[in-house]
A protein has these predicted regions:
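Contiguous, well-ordered alpha-helical segments that form the cores/surfaces of helical PPI scaffolds
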Residues: 122-135, 157, 313
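Glycine-centered flexibility sites
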Residues: 125-128, 238, 316, 329
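Generic structural signal for hydrophobic core residues of well-folded globular domains
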Residues: 132-137, 248, 263, 314-318
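Long insertion/accessory domains within large nucleic-acid-processing enzymes
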Residues: 301-341
């Protein structure tokens, strides 16, 4: 659900996300807010847990390395922009000449002009606040320690300040994006395990936690999870979502409505994950068992992808892992998820 007042407060105007969580900022032409025809130019994501591992518990060193990686990320993003400088409208007529991007350029017009001054966003992403805190401080769970919560928030604020500076320097609408990490959760962790070995609380699970989200194994109620995550969207207003995991609550819709009402004044964008799986062999409807090898009907054991329907929200959007399986890291993360009600 999109909570109107919070979307306006956090992003500057009301709009729906692009994809699962990418939000544009406010942009006006001739005094009128424009949303249609705008776009994001791409994302470069930072592996925060790796930086924390390399810092070896030294917070000052962590921020020194982080600033080095930020400079590299900016260079990569500016390279994306540079590739557009001499691109002509004729390379994609539907986008640039027929109105899909809100303009009707001539064939030999440069397209770069329509991405400037905040019309298009370009984003810095990040992954693994949970593992970063574990690697850097070794002081318990971030949820249970107010000091660690503040450390996590401060890291994201540092990233947010960086993109604000880039925007002031370049005129392009740099934004901070809480990377969905459907693939990066597996890839970054796998690369770090290969280089640094298995580290408790960091690389030992086979995946990194999605952006700023609470550890999927932490058993809390949906209200407390909202309170934990609500500090991040205002900092990462180029991309965000908060969500809760629920059992089948068709007979207790008032409870779900109560959570939605609670979310309204706290977060801009909230997802409700409830089981809607179905077995075409025995007729079972509910929640399939998630294993390292896939999803299985709890009633008859059926796991034939052609005879089941499985739906999961992963990284902000709904997918069908029976038809398009997750990578090993994301499958493990989904398997470890606990219910918040």
């Amino acid at each position: 659900i999109l909570n109107y007042d919070q979307v306006v407060k956090v992003t500057g105007s009301f709009k729906a996300p692009m994809g699962c969580r990418s939000f544009l900022g406010a942009y006006e032409e001739d005094g009128e807010q424009i949303h249609d025809g705008r776009n994001n130019l791409g994302v470069v994501s930072l592996n925060l847990p790796r930086i924390a591992i390399e810092a070896k518990g030294d917070e000052k060193r962590f921020y020194e390395i982080l600033d080095q990686r930020l400079a590299l990320a900016k260079k990569a993003l500016m390279t994306r922009i540079a590739r557009l400088e001499h691109t002509k409208a004729r390379v994609a007529p539907i986008l640039y000449m027929e109105g899909a991007c809100g303009v009707r350029l001539k064939a030999d017009d440069n397209v770069a002009q329509i991405f400037k001054n905040g019309r298009a966003s370009i984003s810095l992403g990040y992954i693994g606040i949970h593992e970063t805190i574990n690697a850097l401080y070794h002081q318990g769970h971030i949820y249970d320690d107010e000091m660690l919560r503040e450390k996590g928030r401060a890291i994201v604020e540092h990233l947010s300040n960086a993109v604000k500076q880039w925007r002031a320097e370049t005129g392009y609408a740099f934004s901070l994006y809480s990377t969905p990490s459907e693939n990066l959760c597996d890839r970054f962790c796998r690369l770090d395990t290969k280089q640094f070995g298995v580290i408790d609380g960091v690389t030992d699970k086979g995946y990194y936690t999605n952006s700023y989200h609470l550890d999927v194994e932490k058993k809390v109620n949906p209200y407390d999870k909202l309170d934990f995550e609500m500090v991040y969207p205002p900092l990462a207003n180029g991309g965000f979502i908060c969500y809760g995991e629920y059992p089948n609550i068709q007979h207790n819709l008032k409870a779900l409505e109560d959570v939605w009402n609670y979310s309204y004044d706290r977060v801009p964008y909230y997802g409700t994950n409830t089981p809607i799986d179905e077995c075409y062999e025995c007729g079972f409807t509910g929640e399939f068992e998630c294993t390292s090898k896939g999803f299985t009907c709890p009633k008859c054991g059926n796991h034939d992808s052609e005879k089941v329907s499985v739906t999961r929200r992963v990284c902000g959007y709904l997918g069908s892992p029976d038809a398009r399986p997750f990578n090993a890291g994301k499958q493990e993360e989904v398997k470890r998820r606990v219910k918040h009600m």
